[in-house]
Amino acid sequence: MENISNRDKALILNQALPYIQKYTGKTVVIKYGGSAMENPELKKKVMSDVALLSTVGINVIVVHGGGKDITAMLNKIGKESKFINGLRYTDSETAEVVKMVLAGKVNKDLVASLENCGGKCLGICGIDGKMFKVSKYKGDDDLGFVGDVDHVDTDLLNTIITNKYIPIVATIGCDDEGNVYNINADTAAARIAESLKAETLIYMTDTPGLLKDKDDENTLISQINIKDIDNLIKDGTISGGMIPKVKHCIDAVENGVSKVFIIDGRLCHSLLIEMFTDEGIGTMFHKD
């Protein structure tokens, strides 16, 4: 709320109050990534917003990936990153790097950042408490140690939330044999939100949301019924990497999440604008 007059701050808080009251005691899952995670100034503002959400009584869960950090570490050890149809191929050596980077560096950096902004948080991963029951990715391509989340045991998450901490979740998990798998963060966020019957799931991205014209950010679709999604995929309005993200949104809504949003994480305080204002800022997915 930099460079805003006291009068405008009061008006903003007045508008936010009913939304704060609505969300108090509810669970909000935030998939954190993109520029909001890579830009230090944006990162600080997002962590400050997350701390604020927790302070007003919202049960916040942050789910993160860390693809660029994984690639950087692989480069340091002289190992080339391999992608198949845009998805990282994870052999056994890469799986060890993924485990080290996501559950180590990235997760603990986020914990430190959020704690520095006044949040109480705990960094965990899908292996902890056997939170994720994982099996090998079932898509058309063999991606090595890339996993699907078959089940989320919510006991650990509920324990952390009950004790007024914010879980920060790194998206790795293991199967019944103890093999460690790299898990898509969008997938993990959706499964967590579904398992907790969260009030809201928010994907922070590098796009304003769904656009009628992908080259014109002024064509934002502010809300959409999930039954209309297939037509937008067929006519090419939704394409490329946005298709799997949107399908996760559909799954979440169909499995008990009240509202799902795709918002522009490049904009300062986009979380607060989406949650606490009449207009919002991204695309909301809902059903009848």
Swiss-Prot record:
EC id: 2.7.2.8
Leading EC class: transferase
Keywords on record: Amino-acid biosynthesis, Arginine biosynthesis, ATP-binding, Cytoplasm, Kinase, Nucleotide-binding, Transferase
Protein name: Acetylglutamate kinase
Purpose: Catalyzes the ATP-dependent phosphorylation of N-acetyl-L-glutamate.
Pathway: Amino-acid biosynthesis; L-arginine biosynthesis; N(2)-acetyl-L-ornithine from L-glutamate: step 2/4
Keyword presence, Iron: no
PANTHER family for the chain: N-ACETYLGLUTAMATE SYNTHASE, N-ACETYLGLUTAMATE SYNTHASE, MITOCHONDRIAL
Entry GO terms, CC: cytoplasm
Lineage: Bacteria, Pseudomonadati, Spirochaetota, Spirochaetia, Brachyspirales
Localization: Cytoplasm
InterPro entries tied to this protein: AceGlu_kinase-like_sf, AcgluKinase_fam, ArgB, Asp/Glu/Uridylate_kinase, Glu/AcGlu_kinase, NAGK-C
Catalytic activity reported: N-acetyl-L-glutamate + ATP = N-acetyl-L-glutamyl 5-phosphate + ADP
Site (Transition state stabilizer): 31, 245
A GO term, aspect molecular function: acetylglutamate kinase activity
Binding-site positions, substrate: 66-67, 88, 182
Family from the record: Belongs to the acetylglutamate kinase family. ArgB subfamily.
One record GO biological process: L-arginine biosynthetic process
Predominant location category: cytoplasm
Record Gene3D superfamilies: Acetylglutamate kinase-like
